[in-house]
Amino acid sequence: MVNRRWQLHVWELTGPPDGWEQQLKQHLAAEPVFAVISGLGGNNWEPVHRFCEAESVPCLFPNVEVPAGRDEDFYSVYFSRGVLLEAQLIAHQLQDAGEGIRRVVQVYRAGDVGEHAAEALKAASPGRQIENRVLKLHGSSKDLSALLQDLGAADALVLWLRPEDLKALPSEPARTSQVWISGEMGGLEFAPLPAAWRVAARIAYPVDLPGQRVVRVDYTLSWFRIRHIPVVAQQVQADTYLACGLVAETLNHIVDAFVRDYLIERIEMALDHRVLTGYYPHLTLAPGQRFASKGGYIVRFADPAGARLTPVGEWITP
């Protein structure tokens, strides 16, 4: 085996998303990389996904809130469907609720990923009366109260909102039969809900419970502490560490067979047996499966204050 020194290139994309694919092609021509590892994409990864599929470049476990891929794709793999998985979890709960809910009202801010999640929930709930209410992109969080005034006991409320908007909810919760919030958008167990809302709300939670993932995540945090790397976005950093570790281990196993398709196949084979899976209880990939974590919980706050959670039922694989 020939010893090789791997070099990391950082590609930064600028300007509007419709120009990203051309920038990526220019980067690839100048630096013909073997794979794209992790990455930070926020709410729009579609141009990067298209590029990786078109150029046959493995695109491995990016940090994105709305994955662009489909299970039928090959070169792009993700840890989770993100808020789209949360929409499926809530749809599962709505199905269990039967006819007791007359109307589902979804609230999201224009231009944010909650819009995609709201579309996914509507698509997963055929026959339901679903009404979307939209906060203006740069509007005041105080406008939330007006959007919730007419809700009643036969309604359910879904909040696809960031922490800043959750903080601005009125002190008394809406008089609905059910309230769900997005865990990924709201901050998971640190979602800053007003006290009365904490009692009423259920959280779509697309990762393992804090007490069950603590050992796996602490292993990663210890690695950061030893190297004096500040932790400023714990899940993003843990997922990035996991992605880099998976790729490093896989490269050791493929010896000199540096073929991009083979890298994907080896990751599929190795992932199912991995013990340290970070935020996720179990990860698995296979042909026709491009999202490694396939389920989540519905949880509620256990106390009037603090971050302790109680699951409302078992792990759900929608």
Where are these regions (language model features)?
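Extracytosolic ligand-binding ectodomains
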Residues: 1-318
